[in-house]
Amino acid sequence: MSTCGRKALTLLSSVFAVCGLGLLGIAVSTDYWLYLEEGIILPQNQSTEVKMSLHSGLWRVCFLAGEERGRCFTIEYVMPMNSQMTSESTVNVLKMIRSATPFPLVSLFFMFIGFILSNIGHIRPHRTILAFVSGIFFILSGLSLVVGLVLYISSINDEMLNRTKDAETYFNYKYGWSFAFAAISFLLTESAGVMSVYLFMKRYTAEDMYRPHPGFYRPRLSNCSDYSGQFLHPDAWIRGRSPSDISSDASLQMNSNYPALLKCPDYDQMSSSPC
């Protein structure tokens, strides 16, 4: 991968991580995951009359119609004890939603840790392991979030299937924008995790590619030799020596490969004495 492509992928993963973290934070802190509406069907003209309407999040429920209009309560205390404005189906749905609450919180924690590690990895590119660890945290965050979303949906669907249907009443529900933010956050988080792991693999491969093999290094020839580098690369060794040294080395190598075949004969010493 080229340097430009790697930088673009790094920037894209950072943007996805920021958007995913922001959307999930908004989704967890707001009360627009689910809209519920209860009413009766008037037999005269088959019109409907809304008896209760509310929107709920992971922590609170706020009424939009009925005697409690404009008031919000926590999920544990859906409404005052003397109020009978909600049916058993609504109460059961709001109670079952609590089983899915821990998973978005765990997902938010994992996403925050992955975001911090990812930024540190971008600031210090030589620490390639941080990209891998942040990618793992992003993937775990996405898995935790999708488990929470599945539990949230299944809790509502189970209650709808077990609910006793009545021809005189109706019960409608729809998912709100907080739920949509959480779903989009899952897609962004998983994408950021996959890109972080991919960047780690590319950086690790590039490091292995440009790391010289130990066999390419030249060992020390002798302790008192001019070739004093114990692990000197051959190319650097050639570039670091002067032309005269290189020619001397070539002549020495030629003499060692082609020894002299003829030797100077030994002459007997001639005496100058007349005897």
From Swiss-Prot:
A single GO molecular-function term is: channel regulator activity
What name does this protein carry? Voltage-dependent calcium channel gamma-5 subunit
**Where would you find the membrane-spanning parts of this chain?**
8-28, 103-123, 129-149, 181-201
Which keywords describe this protein according to UniProt? Answer: Cell membrane, Membrane, Postsynaptic cell membrane, Synapse, Transmembrane, Transmembrane helix
State if Transcription is listed as a keyword: no
Principal location listed in the UniProt entry: membrane
The question of whether Membrane is a record keyword is answered with: yes
What Pfam family is a match, any one? Claudin_2
The UniProt entry's GO biological process terms, in alphabetical order, are: positive regulation of synaptic transmission, glutamatergic; postsynaptic neurotransmitter receptor diffusion trapping; regulation of AMPA receptor activity; transmission of nerve impulse
Q: How does it sit in the membrane?
A: Multi-pass membrane protein
Q: Which family does it belong to?
A: Belongs to the PMP-22/EMP/MP20 family. CACNG subfamily.
Top-rank lineage group of the source organism: Eukaryota
InterPro entries found in the cross-reference section: CACNG_subunit, PMP22/EMP/MP20/Claudin, VDCC_g5su, VDCC_gsu
**Could you give the subunit structure recorded for this chain?**
The L-type calcium channel is composed of five subunits: alpha-1, alpha-2/delta, beta and gamma. Acts as an auxiliary subunit for AMPA-selective glutamate receptors (AMPARs). Found in a complex with GRIA1, GRIA2, GRIA3, GRIA4, CNIH2, CNIH3, CACNG2, CACNG3, CACNG4, CACNG7 and CACNG8. Interacts with GRIA1, GRIA2, GRIA3 and GRIA4.
What exactly does this protein do? Regulates the gating properties of AMPA-selective glutamate receptors (AMPARs). Modulates their gating properties by accelerating their rates of activation, deactivation and desensitization. Displays subunit-specific AMPA receptor regulation. Shows specificity for GRIA1, GRIA4 and the long isoform of GRIA2. According to PubMed:18817736, shows only specificity for GRIA2 and specifically to the form of GRIA2 for which a single amino acid in the pore region has been edited from a glutamine to an arginine residue. Thought to stabilize the calcium channel in an inactivated (closed) state.
Subcellular location(s): the record lists:
Membrane; Postsynaptic density membrane
GO cellular component: a single term: glutamatergic synapse
